[in-house]
A protein has these predicted regions:
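Juxtamembrane intracellular "pre-TM" segments in multi-pass secondary transporters
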Residues: 1-5, 202-234
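Conserved MFS/SLC helix-loop-helix module at the cytosolic interface between two early adjacent transmembrane helices
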Residues: 65-104
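Cytoplasmic membrane-interface "Motif A"-like loop-to-helix N-cap segments
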Residues: 75-87, 287-301
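Cytoplasmic helix-loop-helix junction between adjacent transmembrane helices
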Residues: 110-148
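Glycine-rich segments within core transmembrane alpha-helices of 12-TM secondary carriers
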Residues: 139-165, 363-376
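A late C-terminal transmembrane helix in Major Facilitator Superfamily
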Residues: 350-385
Length: 403
């Protein structure tokens, strides 16, 4: 008989924690890219491709290579092996990044290690929910996992500027990066240890009758690509996740484009706050009403005004404060809808592609979003962000087409 065990909440908690620190490490410098360039001055060419923004882009580059191998490990050997591999690498590389924070090269190498670990965690969201949660709770479990990712990004966006010298008008501008990265490093290491100790593969009996996959990894991919709804989901993630990855990675540059001198991280922070609220509400409603499609449509339509406001804020006023306020409000709206679509899309994809392995369908969605995110960030950051405004306009157009 299917049974839901209380230990499922322990599993979800440790999975959420490892997601939090993974996202902190991803964007630790994204909101403070300009003062970080001062801290690492002389260690890289600011006008080259290998700059501060490249640290966030590493995650996307490596994900394209490691996503399918990670999904294969999770599908073949289980979530305990897959997530444990990721957690061990996250703990070691996160701590090394903090200990060797003064060396830009060392930070880049540690970031590569963190990027290798990323798909072993991100691709396991639906696998964790299916192995441990009954069908009626899976949208909520996926939503809470996404919520943890957003909390991690929010910490990176909001807390980091307070831990370093981020105001160019202050004498300590560009300092404090060593202690900040070391603090994040020890936090990451501690969470990784807890994850390794508490993680379990599956409960003694399945939580639902459909909890066991029937397809192998290769069969699952072929089955997934035959599903029309899955092909639509791949397109939506191709656009939506790509935009989210690009905006998250370039948040400080977007703030500069809006005329904001202080690297306060609020544009990215409010997008994350909106995403946290959305991920707390819409997946729960989706579970309650047993509907996925209608809420996905709401998310796609709702992101349009947010993207337009963020792109064309400067067209509404010449006052910097007003432009910044419009950018902040638009960022919140964009985050609420675009970030709620993630957990809904993952769970919907797992359901329409059953009995294909869940981590395979999720890995494919993440893969296409990382691909476009990489392309977008590369285009936005080239020649000292020369094409940033044009890229934002393209995002606005793509959001309308998707809706």
């Amino acid at each position: 008989m299917p049974k839901a065990y209380p230990y499922r909440w322990v599993i979800l908690l440790v999975f959420m924690l490892i997601n939090v620190v993974l996202q902190i490490q991803w964007l630790a410098l994204a909101a403070v890219a300009r003062p970080a360039a001062v801290f690492y001055q002389g260690q890289f060419d600011p006008s080259s491709f290998l700059n501060i923004d490249f640290l966030a882009m590493i995650y996307m580059v490596v994900f394209l290579v490691m996503s399918f191998p990670a999904s294969y490990v999770i599908d073949t050997y289980g979530i305990r092996v897959g997530i444990s591999l990721g957690a061990a690498l996250i703990g070691v590389c996160g701590l090394l990044k903090g200990v060797l924070a003064k060396s830009f090269l060392a930070v880049v190498i540690a970031q590569v290690g963190l990027a290798v670990a990323q798909p072993f965690v991100l691709n396991a969201v639906t696998a964790v929910s299916v192995r441990w949660f009954p069908l009626r709770e899976r949208g909520t479990a996926a939503g809470l996992s996404a919520l943890a990712q957003y909390v991690g990004i929010l910490i990176a966006m909001i807390a980091t500027p307070f831990m370093v010298g981020s105001d160019p008008a202050e004498p300590g501008y560009g300092t404090g990066f060593g202690p900040m990265l070391l603090t994040y490093g020890w936090l990451t290491f501690g969470v990784a240890v807890v994850t390794l100790l508490l993680l379990r593969e599956r409960p003694p009996t399945p939580p639902s009758a459909d909890s066991r996959e029937k397809h192998s990894f290769g069969e699952g991919i072929r089955h997934i690509l035959k599903q029309r709804d899955m092909r639509i989901m791949l397109y939506l993630f191709f656009v939506g996740l790509g935009i989210f990855n690009a905006v998250s990675s370039m948040t400080d540059s977007i703030a500069a484009n809006a005329g904001v001198e202080d690297s306060d991280g609020l544009i990215g922070g409010l997008m994350l706050i909106g995403g946290i609220l959305g991920a707390s509400i819409l997946p729960v409603l989706s579970d309650r009403f047993r509907k996925r499609k209608v809420f996905l449509v709401i998310c796609v339509v709702g992101m349009v005004p947010g993207m337009f406001g963020l792109t064309y804020a400067g067209s509404f006023s010449t006052d910097v404060a007003t432009v910044y306020a419009i950018s902040l409000a638009s960022s919140f709206v964009l985050g609420f809808f675009i970030m709620s679509a993630g957990p809904l899309g993952f769970q919907y994809a797992a359901e329409v592609t059953h009995p294909a392995p869940e981590s395979t369908s999720q890995g494919m969605l993440l893969w296409v979003g990382q691909l476009t995110g990489l392309i977008f960030v590369a285009f936005m950051s080239v020649e000292s962000n020369r094409y940033l405004s044009a890229s934002l306009s393209a995002f606005a157009f793509l959001s309308v087409v998707s809706a």
